[in-house]
């Protein structure tokens, strides 16, 4: 484990209660990485409870997929131990970055369960270092394009700034932003909510 990573939530369970033969780190094609982090939320708290709620709900769903006519979990889904770095947003981002990059190098499809938006910074950084011409699709009400907020560039309001600088960022559903973010956004890659509800969209 990379220096700076703190593991607080360990699990012996598998995702959605799938058989253990499909939930091992070695055989799984997919890694689910819980990051119950809520350190920079500035209005409502509670995003840190998301991963646990998601995992509990997963145990009550059907595992057969109608669209693919298959049981997709048989490709293997590994539920990794949660990263819960609480000391600072900088250390959390580094922890996520190191862990995600390690799994990518092991040829795993990494999916994170959060957590507030700042957890995306480390993951996007890891993917952009491993893949050329990366496109990031952001579905969100806010652009999160501030270079810094409340003294940190790792704040939830800055979650997409680095992605804008290093990847092809496409933002969909935007309905609220700060004026300063209009100066850095790529207007051709932003789809505002009020435009999407029109008949001409």
Predicted regions and their residues:
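Short, Lys/Arg-enriched N-terminal segments with co-localized hydrophobic residues
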Residues: 1-8
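Conserved alpha-helical scaffold segments that buttress catalytic/binding sites
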Residues: 8-201
């Amino acid at each position: 484990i990379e220096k700076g990573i703190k593991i607080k939530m360990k699990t012996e369970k598998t995702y959605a209660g799938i058989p253990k033969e499909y939930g091992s780190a070695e055989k799984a094609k997919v890694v689910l990485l819980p990051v119950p982090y809520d350190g920079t939320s500035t209005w409502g708290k509670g995003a840190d409870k998301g991963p646990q709620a998601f995992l509990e709900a997963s145990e009550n769903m059907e595992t057969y997929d109608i669209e693919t006519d298959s049981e997709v979990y048989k490709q293997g889904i590994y539920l990794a131990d949660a990263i819960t770095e609480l000391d600072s947003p900088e250390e959390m981002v580094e922890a996520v970055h190191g862990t995600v990059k390690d799994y990518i190098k092991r040829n795993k499809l990494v999916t994170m369960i959060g957590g507030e938006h700042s957890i995306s910074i480390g993951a996007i950084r890891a993917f952009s270092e491993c893949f050329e011409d990366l496109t990031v699709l952001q579905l969100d009400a806010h652009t999160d394009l501030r270079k810094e907020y409340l003294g940190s560039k790792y704040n939830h309001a800055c979650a997409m700034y680095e992605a804008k600088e290093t990847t092809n960022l496409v933002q969909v559903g935007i309905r609220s932003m700060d004026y300063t973010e209009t100066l850095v956004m790529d207007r051709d890659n932003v789809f505002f909510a009020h435009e999407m509800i029109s008949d001409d969209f």
